[in-house]
């Protein structure tokens, strides 16, 4: 049996402000830093260790990983930084308040933009300052692969090559793997691993800063998965994520 641990970054400044973040490189709040440190302590106390870690090129995930490694005394563990683990690109919604956007367009439309599988938000113009072109993080990524908006289907297509070419082989080689990423890049992986339908993925919410453990068989098919931490607190955190895109959340 193999184990894989996924963790969404701790609360970011734009999580706190209830804004669509996507590829905008915002940092953690003090609460987010605390959540990440607590996740590291939970993993250490539960006896986990890691041989390799994967994260995105966005600082909220990178810093979360740093905190986890620090608490576990694993700062030496090699880290793979990949744009493929970035948050889903929210296009023209990037930076907008979720509740205000819902008040303008309706809860249902914003839910579709946030959680549907194959409907992307309106795209950025290529000349928009929020577009990824020219960002040194993506200097080695072909321009045609850089998105101006994404739906979850696009995010799955972006994440899976990294899974197939690097993460899955590492797991099969017996390495203990940690992935520190984002709500939607983790949703993409969970959808793939668990075979969740396009319709059912709408209801999946990933809480900030809570380790999600997968136990996998020899074919990397999930045997079971579970969060580490207090179940009641985790349920509240998931409910809060679900509430973010509603007009009443303002």
Swiss-Prot record:
Pfam families referenced in this protein's UniProt entry, alphabetically: His_Phos_1 (PF00300)
What terms describe the molecular function in GO for this protein?
Answer: phosphoglycerate mutase activity
**Residues annotated as site: Transition state stabilizer:** 182
Reactions mediated catalytically: (2R)-2-phosphoglycerate = (2R)-3-phosphoglycerate
Q: Which UniProt keywords apply?
A: Gluconeogenesis, Glycolysis, Isomerase
Gene Ontology biological process terms, A to Z: gluconeogenesis; glycolytic process
Its Enzyme Commission number(s) read 5.4.2.11
Please tell me whether the keyword Isomerase is annotated for this protein.
Answer: yes
Q: In which pathway does it act?
A: Carbohydrate degradation; glycolysis; pyruvate from D-glyceraldehyde 3-phosphate: step 3/5
Matches recorded under InterPro entries: His_Pase_superF_clade-1, His_PPase_superfam, PG/BPGM_mutase_AS, Phosphogly_mut1
Q: Which SUPFAM superfamilies match?
A: Phosphoglycerate mutase-like
Q: Which residues form the active site?
A: 9, 87
Q: Where is the signal peptide?
A: none
Residues noted as binding substrate in the record, renumbered to the chain: 8-15, 21-22, 60, 87-90, 98, 114-115, 183-184
Identify the domain of life: Bacteria
UniProt-listed NCBIfam families: pgm_1, PRK14115.1
Spell out the family assignment given in the record's similarity comment: Belongs to the phosphoglycerate mutase family. BPG-dependent PGAM subfamily.
Q: How does it assemble?
A: Homodimer.
Q: What functional role does this protein have? A: Catalyzes the interconversion of 2-phosphoglycerate and 3-phosphoglycerate.
Q: What is this protein called?
A: 2,3-bisphosphoglycerate-dependent phosphoglycerate mutase
- The organism named in the record is Burkholderia thailandensis (strain ATCC 700388 / DSM 13276 / CCUG 48851 / CIP 106301 / E264)
């Amino acid at each position: 049996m193999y184990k894989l641990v996924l963790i969404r970054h701790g609360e970011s400044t734009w999580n706190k402000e209830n804004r669509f973040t996507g590829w905008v490189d915002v940092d953690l709040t003090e609460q987010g830093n605390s959540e990440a440190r607590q996740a590291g302590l939970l993993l250490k106390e539960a006896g986990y260790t890691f041989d390799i870690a994967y994260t995105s090129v966005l600082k909220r995930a990178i810093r979360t990983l740093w905190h986890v490694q620090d608490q576990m005394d694993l700062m030496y563990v090699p880290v793979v930084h990949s744009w493929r683990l970035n948050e889903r690109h929210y296009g023209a919604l990037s930076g907008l308040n979720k509740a205000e956007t819902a008040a303008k367009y309706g809860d249902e439309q914003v839910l579709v933009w946030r959680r549907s599988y194959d409907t992307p938000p309106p795209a950025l113009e290529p000349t928009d300052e929020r577009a990824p072109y020219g960002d040194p993080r993506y200097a080695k990524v072909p321009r045609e692969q850089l998105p101006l908006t994404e739906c979850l289907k696009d995010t799955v297509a972006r994440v899976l090559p990294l899974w197939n070419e690097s993460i899955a082989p590492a797991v099969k080689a017996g390495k203990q793997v940690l992935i520190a990423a984002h709500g939607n890049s983790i949703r993409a992986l969970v959808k793939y691993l668990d075979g969740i339908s396009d319709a059912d993925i709408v209801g999946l919410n990933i809480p900030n800063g809570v380790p999600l453990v997968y136990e996998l068989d020899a074919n990397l098919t999930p045997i079971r998965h579970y969060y580490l931490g207090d179940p009641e607190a985790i349920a509240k955190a998931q409910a809060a994520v679900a509430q973010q895109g509603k007009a009443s959340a303002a």
